Amino acid sequence: MDGHVQHDGFGRDINYLRIAVTDKCNFRCIYCMPADGVAPRAHDELLSAEEIARFVRLVAGEGIRRVRLTGGEPLVSRRIIPLIRDIRAIPQIEDISLTTNGALLPKLAPQLKDAGLNRVNISLDTLDPTLFGKITRLGRLEQTMAGIDAALAWGFEPVKVNCVVVRRLNQDVAALARLTLDRPIHLRFIEYMPIGDERTSSHCAVDPHAPALNPALWDASDTVPSDELRARINAGAAAVGLGELEPLDINDAPAGAGPARYWHFPGAAGTVGFISAMSNHFCANCTRLRLTADGNVRPCLFSDAEYSVRDALRRGDDMQVLSIWRDAVAHKPQEHAIIEGTQRFMSQIGG
């Protein structure tokens, strides 16, 4: 099957697929998942590794060139290594990446590298061990830091570290940015995006009387614009005698830079990026679709519009799978409508 470029209704090249391989996780982050996890699904409700790989093979013929594996936590899935191998064997796929909390990277990094994984994104919202424990419920800061070190040691390139900034929650952005001084990582600050539907966030709360730890109480005022973040980081740098962030030449941006805009401290080993999903949304350049663990294609993270390919895959009806895919691409919205919200937990979407 020869590959070609597929455009959506607004002329965007659809070349990037994010796949939630599981909705399970070894953490219980307050903005992502209820404290007791998501309701377990019957095995036959979820796509098998073989079905996922076959779907990727089909849409690679429609122009997909980059694949990101997400969850939940993709590394808790026993099928993650063979799945990466199968996707790596698809000639049109140029890049395979994975988003993780990092806790299992020290154990799995060698196998992931051998299977053909190119790069990783690691989630890290704070350097305060106590706050880290409250945000993740089950995680420890040293686990994620060890995961970052393992990713660097095993030569994944680039290693990106993602921090979602919520005004009333995590305040140590300056310290996080300084991790790039001696580590060749790309620390990206992501503006908090209020999804609008409190059904999910109210089930994630740690303490209904502690607003900072209750996502149901977060609102648009908790979004910290990238310009404000950069000013806070520069103020923190000045306080310890460092120079201000300088803009990075676009040609020096890390692979898969996507919507992030990158800066760096003078002489630093890494970079600092800003993803301005709210203050300067990047929908006009969005080239991605998502596949959920139960076999639904989502054209947009912030819409509940889904197109199920599971039954067609199981019937072996490749033409029907492609017809559903093309329909999903054709209905990708021009821009997100965050106010509409979503009926799924973030761990089920693979956001």
Predicted regions and their residues:
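Radical SAM/AdoMet-radical enzyme domain recognition
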Residues: L46-L69, S77-I190
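Radical SAM enzyme [4Fe-4S]-AdoMet core and its adjacent flexible, acidic
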Residues: T130-G133, L138-M145, D149, A153-T271
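N-terminal [4Fe-4S]-dependent radical SAM core
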Residues: M1-R18, R28-I30, G61, A260-T271, ...
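Canonical Radical SAM [4Fe-4S] cluster-binding loop centered on the CxxxCxxC motif
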Residues: F10-A49
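Conserved, mostly hydrophobic/aromatic
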Residues: V21, C25, C29, L69, ...
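Conserved beta-strand segments that form the floor/walls of ligand-binding pockets within enzyme
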Residues: Y16, A20, R68, T99, ...
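Flexible mid-to-C-terminal extensions adjoining Fe-S/redox cofactors in radical SAM and related proteins
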Residues: F274, M278-G351
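Conserved G/P- and acidic residue-centered "switch" motifs that form tight phosphate/ATP-binding loops
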Residues: E73
